[in-house]
Swiss-Prot record:
SUPFAM superfamilies: FabD/lysophospholipase-like (SSF52151), FMN-linked oxidoreductases (SSF51395), Thioesterase/thiol ester dehydrase-isomerase (SSF54637). This is Fatty acid synthase beta subunit pkiC. Its EC number is 2.3.1.86, 4.2.1.59, 1.3.1.9, 2.3.1.38. Pathway: Secondary metabolite biosynthesis. It holds the Pfam family FAS1_thioest_ins. The gene is pkiC. Gene3D superfamilies: 1.20.1050.120, 1.20.930.70, 3.30.1120.100, 3.30.70.3320, 6.10.60.10, Aldolase class I (3.20.20.70), Hotdog Thioesterase (3.10.129.10), Malonyl-Coenzyme A Acyl Carrier Protein, domain 2 (3.40.366.10). It comes from the Eukaryota. One of its GO terms (molecular function) is (3R)-hydroxyacyl-[acyl-carrier-protein] dehydratase activity. Belongs to the fungal fatty acid synthetase subunit beta family.
Length: 1872
């Protein structure tokens, strides 16, 4: 970039001069500033600005300007002069420039960009919408302001605070608490600090060390791991920020959120130039949401900066302790892994569930419903009432998951409920878990609160110290009136008391509420206080989407912005007023739009179709709508409009009401209105009913029809929003929103009247051009008054919500000028109506004389329940609700009754009627009868035709008849339409004469079609009869059904009960007189409202102005920070020199080379300097040198007097290790013995006898398994998980891994024996195996003991292996074995021979023949107990133990002993003993069993292991091994001392393998067992690598197979970063509670079991004895021969005479028969005698296959359905032979088959059928089915019974005869 030549003020300075200038001291600069200034130009890339620099400083600033522009030309990307100027300020901050120079530049910047019109926040907010950039620019500005040290200018108080000081505004400060902010609080604090570091430096300097020291203290450090709460580092370096889950936890988020709130308050004070005392004086009150209450207390007690920081430090410490205590007091529960969200950013299950969409009463009822199934300690509580329909429920996570599941069931999400009555709808519930780690505001935290209160008992803040009111979040009371300690009150309010937020914020009527929170607090407050005249100020934001909210721009502006002004409440802003004059008038905003009082008459068909009635209302001074729904063509409507125009004053315009749901009509009606408007007809308004058009269509109406206002009648919340959207797009055009809800007369929605308005009133009132009118249910002044004043909503707990006008409809139907027939008026007057709470009863039937039916447009419509309307309602249910196809069928079946009802009850009778007055079809009528029927129905005697179009219709039919019949053409000329119009009787007489055949000829089908087509001709008034029961029946019945209410004379028999009368169910209460003029009705309502307003007001109220004032600030202020309270960070760290350390004989670990001195002993120098040392005769790496070098916190001290070297290693969390080194000769002598003695003291507290024999038994102390022990165990391994509290099941069974803790004493005792040898410093734990004895578990409360034996001592490549097996006993009965394998690394050879004991797996040997028996008996190790007893047919189980002693020559001395058992009839029998002793190289006994036997526990390995649920879990090892050492009593220093671990040659303190195993086992419990740890039978963990504290691992589980009914799992733990394996494990798990169900007859199918038969090689082949039946399964058609042996099978039958005789089961089978053929028409598989054995055989074989693969659970239950009970019995008891069972089934089936008669093909007359009542209908229950079956059986005299009750209400099976129709062919009635 080429710099333009700068004017003459530019001077060239070289770089050396610039550097000299930059480094010049303030004293060398001019002492005073010249008043004259020079405009310094800045120009870069087309952007330029000027700064007016005092001449005194120009020479100092100009070089920096040049250097800046030179550097910026290659780097910057400037978009505006302001951005360029701020970049220059940033550039100057990096230069060493005098504060005076910076001050001059700052004043020039402010003058150029701020002037007197703005302040920096608004300026930067307009500069960029990007938050990061805004933070950067604000940070630059305020750091520059700090560097300039400009204290000469006073900071002007912002306009809001100026108004507060003069009491024009009443300010309330509100602080936020836990919620979504829990995850974002650190990020928000970092952003705040980035923008306002100079203002927050001291605050962070106070809070930061406080939190850090607390988090690293002994009391709390275990939770924070390696992440102590370092606030300064977290907010200044994003690399130090912990993960969001950790941040959101209460021990972190609670204090950080509190600090953030107070930081925002601190910034506000600084920017406005106020100290906390001055700021507090401008606040009327304060409170806080949940923990925000404590921040409010800080504000109330702070009168200066010092007091503010002091109170802040105390409250932040309190919040820290409260967060920690509450977090650890949270109730534990078992939450399945599947319930946790896998989606990033989604909140998983937590302790608090936010829900919205229910009222408080409904919410409490829902909580009670869930709590009813929960124990007392798992219950849920209503924790927060955030708004009238917004709550937070808190409690155990598992309980909240139940609540969430229930909410999903009852919510209406994704369900369209628009056509369901409001009170019958499911609620639409939105719910989500909050990122909160404890259930605040519940009794669960009562004890936690008590502990915190105790900690602060000595540091109280009495409530009398509160200088301003602070309102309690539960009671809403001023804390000062409560007395006592404010901190204690707040602690209880946060921890254990529910929060009633509306109560808290409503305690004081503030004009402005300042919210020091960025989350949802401001919108929540606005929602709670909306309409109350409260302006919400978002102190933490520069922007807002809500036009009524204020932001930081408003808060700091020196001139009042439009969004800062004081708001009026809805009650004040929209209340009605009284205008003085000759007559006091009621006025609302609507008056100016309509030019009439705010009580108007709605468009309604047929009442306001008549222009004379509309004119009467308008001439009375009121507004009324002309209903377009009663006009069927443009000419008629045009005539009516002109008639109306001519009948009203010239200055009045008319409003037309059109039905949007009728597209055909509205299209020509809109065109008509457009044409008339263009012709200067004064059409002022348009009302659209029955639907809201799109924005495009509505805009077209507004812009092209010449309207002055437009009205819409939305029917739902969504439609209301559409109306508001239309108004928003046309802000200068009046939009009237007419709301009637579902209670209005005529067409209505399914909505409640009040709820939609309550939900949308706020958005309606945001648009000043929307006028809200209430309709439906009004009839007198008392009903109108609450809605005009808004008191209706106050009674419901909401702010006053006035309407601008009232809409009357039904009430006007009885007005004197209305065309309503007298008979109809009398019906209306007699209709009682209902209250508002009862109108929804009209959906199910008449209520108050009114009923809801479905109109021709498919919409609900209110009508008086006359006979005709009741018929309508009946047909809606029975006919019109059916599909088209089903409807025609129903009409055909019920034709006669429907016609009868039409003729008796409805205004539109059945058209077909012959000369005798009989109801007939059209095809049964003559041509003349049709004409006579038309005139009889369409012409009213002594009056006229009902409609002119009816004359044309009748003439068209007559002409058609003449075309079809022979007639006298000359005489026909007299059949004119004029004659028909005037004298229809004369017309018919002439027609009969002219066409004599018309009287006798029946209608031709083509003429019938022509007639029906004419009945539906568009543009003609719909016919007033029903011509046919066809597809158009609904059209004929419902179309044009309202006019009869005004012309009862035209109705058959002049019967008003036939007609449809529109009327509202509530408004019916007011129509008691039928002769009041319209003006009188309206005046009485209006005057009554005026009278009540005069009674309630002391002076006449004036109507609020329609226009809203919008002002623009004239100037903006310049901000200067004069009273800032910032301080530089200081460090008190003292550094000691190395020489001082050396003189004091103390050495740091900064480096070995600098530590030793020549004066120190040689052994010490060698110890600390040499790379290697001699251990005995072996050269080893020097562990001491490594220790010193690798431990930065190690201190070495040398005591010259005692010649001792002291080494102290400081670990994190204040754990120290200490070592004393003394030089002695012969240090290796008895070294291992001394180490064993040391470990003996560590493990057992005393020096144990090491000479005990390896073959002895070691006994441990008695231990009681207490809940405290379990809690300590959970707390110890808990830190490994993200939240272990959700992994704690409700069970008294202890984790299997606690076995090692119980047995550690006896497991570790053999390790110190002299015979084992080995260096305990090099001891490694290789594996642990835990295995329960069958059906035993360790439980809380058990008193147990332990004993152990050494099972093996032998050498392998790594060293000497020692295996110790312990038994845990309860009441001297073994419960669990714990086997631990240890390795003494590098140690080999002992004073005793190596040996190994083992309990072998059980083996099964089946002796199937004498040959097998002889082989077994030939083994000399097999010794039968009874040699005379044969073993053939026995299945023996070998239970063996082996002892191996290893010899140096490679041979081994083997001793195998055990027993061979057999099970007979459920009893164990000892058949032989096994005893083998010999020296050998293998195990002959096991070799034999492996060749000829099989494992007793069947096992299956899956080809593809896996797990259907979540199979992995990330863990992080606990930060310290000390807790597990204390718990397990394994104080091996290699786990706790860095000195020892270094001496042992490992990189650090190793985690206990037992701990790693326990952590992995808990993962298995959680992921695989769902917390049901009682199912865990065996667990083995093998340690494959070292694990260090805080290492991140991934634990994975897989289901690998089955063994003897148990599930086999593999467990793998590996490092997360490298995938290196650190633990491998296996587990055996009992299956979940299992039931095996066996089906009965009817479940058979062709080919069943064939796949199994082909693939099975085991148990299934044993069932080949049932091959006869498998053949029947393979084919269902071939006959099958059976031989002689079944001759003797008979069954007893009863003859008709009662005699009992024996009958052969197989008739025709004789002693001489050579064969017998079974037959069945569907195949033998469907013959009972073959189906039953085939089913049982299949079930037995399938179950045997399951058992052979190890799938069958031992604890299962068995059940069978009918025949299946035999299958269940066979599976349960192995003593029942399969062959016998099959044979029994065949006999049973044969007897059953022979018990009923059959035909020649074997078929019977009996059958079974499954029934599902739900498929019939909801009315069809089990009782109905039982009644139906009984009646059919009684009428048919045949067998029919319900024989199976399978699923209640869904599946029943009936049995009985088939093909027996009921006599008479009629179905029995189900009624009664």
């Amino acid at each position: 970039m080429a710099l333009e030549e700068v004017p003459s003020v530019s001077r060239d300075l070289d770089h050396s001069a610039l550097r000299a200038l930059s480094s010049a001291s303030p004293s060398s600069l001019p002492s005073s500033c010249s008043r004259s200034t020079t405009s310094l130009l800045f120009q870069s890339k087309g952007i330029e600005f000027r700064l007016s620099i005092p001449d005194t400083f120009l020479s100092l600033v100009e070089p920096h300007r040049n250097a800046f522009l030179a550097s910026y030309s290659t780097q910057g990307n400037t978009q505006s002069p302001l951005e360029l100027a701020l970049s220059f300020l940033y550039f100057l901050l990096d230069q060493k420039v005098s504060p005076l120079v910076l001050s001059s530049v700052l004043r020039a910047f402010n003058l150029e960009f701020l002037g007197n019109r703005s302040e920096i926040h608004s300026l930067i907010a307009d500069l960029t919408p990007i938050p990061k950039q805004r933070q950067r620019w604000l940070g630059i500005y305020y750091r520059f302001l700090e560097a300039s040290d400009d204290k000469r200018a006073e900071i002007p108080l912002s306009s809001i605070f100026q108004h507060a000081r003069t009491n024009e505004f009443q300010l309330m400060a509100v602080f936020g608490g836990q919620g979504e902010c829990s995850r974002t609080c650190l990020n928000e604090f970092a952003e705040l600090y980035s923008s306002y570091e100079p203002m927050l430096r001291r605050l962070v300097g106070v809070i930061g060390p406080c939190l850090y020291n607390l988090s690293t203290s002994d009391e709390y450090s275990s939770y924070y791991r390696n992440q102590p709460l370092d606030l300064k580092a977290w907010i200044t370096d994003e690399n130090h920020v912990p993960d969001l889950g950790f941040v959101a936890s209460a021990p972190v988020s609670v204090p950080v959120i509190g600090a953030l709130s107070l930081a925002r308050y601190c910034v506000t004070c600084h920017i406005t130039g106020c100290n906390p005392g001055l700021m507090r004086s401008m606040l009327r009150t304060a409170t806080g949401h949940s923990q925000g209450l404590l921040a409010a207390i800080v504000v109330a007690v702070s009168h200066s900066w010092d007091s503010f920081y002091q109170a802040t430090e105390e409250v932040i410490e309190l919040l820290f302790r409260l967060g920690w205590e509450c977090h650890h007091a949270a109730p534990c529960s078992m939450v399945p892994a599947a319930n946790y969200a896998d989606v990033d950013g989604a909140n998983g299950p937590s302790y608090m569930l936010s829900l919205r969409g229910l009222k408080r009463q409904e919410t409490e009822a829902t909580i009670d419903h869930v709590n009813a199934s929960l124990p007392e300690d798992k219950r849920l509580y209503l924790a927060l009432i955030n708004a009238y329909d917004q709550f937070v429920v808190a409690g155990p996570v598992a309980s909240l998951l139940r609540l969430e599941s229930h909410l999903v069931e009852i919510t209406s999400k994704d369900i369209d409920q628009s056509r369901i009555p409001f009170r019958d709808r499911k609620p639409y519930i939105q719910h989500s878990f909050l990122p909160v780690s404890t259930p605040f505001h519940t009794p669960y935290l009562t004890r936690a609160a008590a502990r915190v209160k105790k900690q602060f008992a000595a540091r109280p803040i009495p409530t009398r110290r509160l200088a301003i009111p602070v309102y309690h979040t539960h009671t809403g009371l001023d804390l000062r009136k409560q007395g006592g300690c404010a901190l204690s009150i707040a602690i209880d309010a946060i921890a254990s008391e529910p929060c009633n937020w509306p109560c808290a914020v409503a305690s004081y009527h503030a004009s402005h509420i300042l919210t020091f929170d960025r989350g949802g607090l401001a919108p929540l407050i606005k929602r709670v206080r909306e309409g109350c005249g409260v302006r919400v100020v978002q102190v933490a934001d520069l922007d807002t989407r809500d036009s009524e909210m204020a932001t930081m721009r408003d808060l700091f502006a020196t001139k009042l912005l439009p969004t800062s002004t004081k708001l009026q409440s809805w009650g004040q802003q929209f209340r009605p007023g009284l205008a003085s004059g000759p007559k006091i008038q009621l006025e609302t905003r609507l008056n100016r739009v309509l030019g009439a009082p705010p009580i108007m008459v709605a468009g309604m068909t047929p009442t306001t179709v008549h222009p004379d009635f509309v004119a009467a209302i308008m001439n009375a001074g009121y507004h009324a709508e002309l209903a377009g729904g009663g006009y069927h063509n443009a000419s008629a409507m045009e005539a009516a409009i002109y008639d109306l125009v001519s009948s009203i004053p010239k200055e009045r315009g008319i409003t037309c009401n059109l039905i949007y749901a009728n597209p055909r009509s509205i299209s020509w009606q809109i065109e008509l209105l457009r044409r008339l408007s263009n012709g200067n007809v004064r059409i002022d308004g348009l009302t659209i009913g029955a639907g809201v058009p799109s924005l495009t269509v509505a805009s077209e109406y507004i812009e092209t029809l010449g309207l002055r206002h437009i009205s819409f009648k939305p029917g739902s919340v969504a439609a209301i929003r559409k109306v508001v959207e239309i108004a928003r797009e046309h802000p200068d055009f009046p939009v009237i929103l007419q709301w009637t809800g579902g209670r209005g007369g005529g067409h209505h929605s399914f909505e409640d009247f009040h709820a939609p308005i309550i939900a949308t009133y706020g958005i309606i009132r945001q648009e000043p051009n929307v006028y809200l009118v209430a309709g439906s249910g009004f009839g007198d002044s008392d009903s109108v008054y609450p809605y005009l004043t808004g008191s209706w909503s106050v009674a419901m707990g909401h702010p006053a919500m006035p309407f601008d006008g009232i809409l009357l409809g039904s009430r006007m139907m009885v007005a004197k000028e209305a065309h309503t027939s007298p008979a109809v008026r009398r019906i209306i007057a007699a209709t009682p109506g209902v209250s508002d709470s009862e109108w929804e009863k009209t959906y199910s039937g008449p209520a108050g004389g009114v009923i809801t039916v479905t109109s021709e447009m498919g919409e609900p419509i209110h009508k008086i329940a006359t006979r005709g309307v009741c018929l309508w309602a009946d047909l809606d249910k029975t006919v019109f609700s059916l599909s088209r196809r089903d409807r025609l069928t129903y009409l055909a079946q019920h034709r006669r009754s429907i016609i009868q009802r039409l003729n008796a009850d409805f205004a539109k009778p059945w058209f077909g009627c012959n000369s005798d007055g009989e109801a007939v079809d059209l095809e049964d009528m003559t041509y003349l009868e049709v004409l006579k029927r038309l005139t009889a129905l369409m012409f009213v005697p002594n009056k006229q035709w009902i409609d002119a179009s009816y004359i044309e219709f009748t003439m068209t039919i007559a002409q058609r008849w003449l075309q079809r019949l022979q007639f006298d053409s000359e005489a026909a000329a007299s059949l004119t339409i004029s004659l028909l119009r005037k004298a229809p009787d004369r017309f018919l007489a002439i027609f009969a004469d002219v066409c004599p055949t018309a009287e006798g000829d029946l209608l031709n089908p083509e003429d019938i079609s022509f007639f029906l087509m004419q009945c539906k001709t568009p543009g003609r008034k719909p016919v007033n009869f029903i011509p046919a029961l066809d597809d158009d029946f609904e059209f004929y019945f419902k179309k044009d059904s309202l006019w009869q209410a005004e012309d009862v004379d035209a109705v058959l028999d002049q019967d008003a009960e036939r007609v449809c009368i529109l009327h509202g169910p509530i408004a019916a209460r007011y129509s008691k007189s039928d002769s009041e003029p319209a003006g009188y009705i309206l005046d009485s309502i209006l005057n009554g409202v005026v009278a009540r307003l005069r009674e309630t007001s002391t002076a006449e109220m004036l109507l609020p102005k329609l226009e809203r004032g919008h002002t623009t600030p004239a100037s903006w202020s310049t901000l200067s920070l004069t009273e800032r309270d910032t301080s530089e960070e200081t460090s008190d760290t003292s550094i000691t020199s190395l020489s001082e350390l050396i003189e004091n004989h103390s050495f740091s670990s900064g480096g070995v080379d600098s530590v030793p001195r020549p004066s120190h002993p040689l052994w010490m120098r060698a110890l600390l300097e040499d790379d290697v040392v001699l251990q005995g005769t072996l050269r080893q790496k020097n562990p001491f040198r490594d220790l010193i070098q690798s431990s930065p916190n190690t201190v070495v001290n040398y005591n010259q007097d005692s010649s001792e070297l002291m080494v102290t290693a400081q670990e994190p969390y204040h754990i120290s290790s200490f070592m004393r080194a003394v030089c002695h000769d012969g240090v290796m002598d008895k070294r291992n013995e001394r180490i064993k003695s040391f470990y003996s003291l560590l493990w057992f507290g005393h020096d144990c006898d090491t000479s005990q024999s390896l073959n002895g038994v070691f006994y441990g102390p008695d231990i009681t398994l207490t809940e405290d022990l379990l809690d300590e165990y959970n707390a110890t391994i808990g830190p490994a998980y993200s939240d272990h509290r959700q992994m704690v099941p409700s069970t008294d069974v202890l984790p299997i891994s606690m076995g090692i803790i119980i047995a550690w004493d006896v497991i570790s005792r053999p390790l110190i024996l002299r015979q084992i040898g080995g260096d305990l410093l090099r001891l490694v734990h290789r594996s642990n195996t835990f295995e329960y004895y069958s059906d035993t578990r360790l439980r809380l409360g058990d008193s147990v003991s332990s004993r152990s034996e050494v099972q093996a001592v032998y050498d392998d490549d790594g060293g000497r292996v020692v295996i110790v097996e312990a038994q845990i006993l309860r009441s001297r009965v073994p419960v669990m074995t714990v086997t631990s394998t240890f390795l003494f690394r590098g140690s080999k050879g002992t004073t005793v021979p190596a040996f190994r004991r083992a309990r072998e797996q059980k083996w099964t040997y089946d002796v199937t023949s004498e040959f097998e028996e002889s082989i077994l008996l030939s083994r000399n190790w097999f010794r039968p107990c009874d040699p005379s007893l044969t073993l053939v047919g026995k299945s023996m189980i070998f239970d063996l133990n082996s002892l191996v002693k290893y010899h140096d020559d490679g041979n081994m001395e083997l001793h195998v002993q055990g027993t061979a058992m057999s099970q007979t009839n459920g009893q164990q029998q000892k058949l032989a003993i096994v005893d083998f002793r010999n020296t050998c190289t293998g195990n002959p006994v096991l070799d034999f069993l492996q060749r000829r036997g099989k494992l007793a526990e069947p096992r299956t390995e899956f080809k593809i292991p896996g797990w259907a649920g979540k199979s992995t879990m990330d863990i992080q090892m606990p930060p310290s091994n000390e807790p597990y050492a204390q718990l397990s009593k394994d104080f091996n220093p290699i786990h706790t001392s860095p000195i020892f671990s270094s001496l042992a040659g490992v990189p650090g303190t190793l985690c206990h393998g037992m701990c790693t195993s326990a952590i992995a086992e808990r993962v298995l419990e959680h992921l695989g067992l769902g917390g049901d740890r009682e199912r865990l039978r065996r667990f083995e963990a093998r340690f494959t690598d070292m694990v260090m504290p805080l290492e991140k691992l991934v634990v994975e589980i897989k289901h690998t197979g089955m063994v003897d009914g148990r599930m086999c799992f593999s467990i793998l733990a590996k490092r997360k970063e490298t995938d290196e394996r650190v633990l491998e494990g296996d587990a055996e798990v009992e299956q979940p509670r299992t039931a095996y169900l066996f089906t009965g007859q009817g479940s058979q199918s062709k080919g069943m079991g064939m796949d199994l038969y082909k693939t099975s090689t085991g148990q299934f082949l044993l069932t080949n004895k049932g091959g006869l039946f498998w053949t029947s399964c393979k084919t269902t058609q071939s006959p099958l021969p059976i031989r002689q042996k079944y001759l003797d099978i008979t069954t007893e039958v009863v003859l008709p005479n009662g005699k009992r005789v024996q009958k052969p089961v197989f008739p025709g089978l004789t002693p001489t028969s050579t064969s017998y053929t079974f037959r069945h028409p569907r195949g033998l598989l469907y013959s009972t005698q073959f189906a039953q054995p085939a089913i049982l055989l299949f079930e037995a074989a399938a179950f045997a296959e399951l058992r052979a693969k190890g799938y069958v659970s031992h604890g299962a239950v068995y059940a069978g359905h009918s025949l299946g009970e035999f299958g269940a019995l066979s599976a349960l008891s192995r003593s029942v032979p399969t062959g016998a069972l099959v044979e029994l089934a065949f006999y049973r089936g044969s007897v059953m088959q022979a018990s009923v008669a059959s035909d020649n093909d074997g078929g019977t007359t009996y059958g079974m059928v499954a029934m599902n009542p739900k498929r019939v209908g909801t009315f069809f229950t089990q009782t109905t089915l039982d009644r139906l079956v009984s009646q059919i059986a009684a009428q048919s005299q045949e067998l029919l019974e319900i024989v199976n009750f399978n699923i209640e209400g869904e599946q029943y099976v009936c049995s009985g005869t088939i093909d027996r129709p009921i006599s008479g062919g009629t179905w029995p009635s189900l009624s009664g």
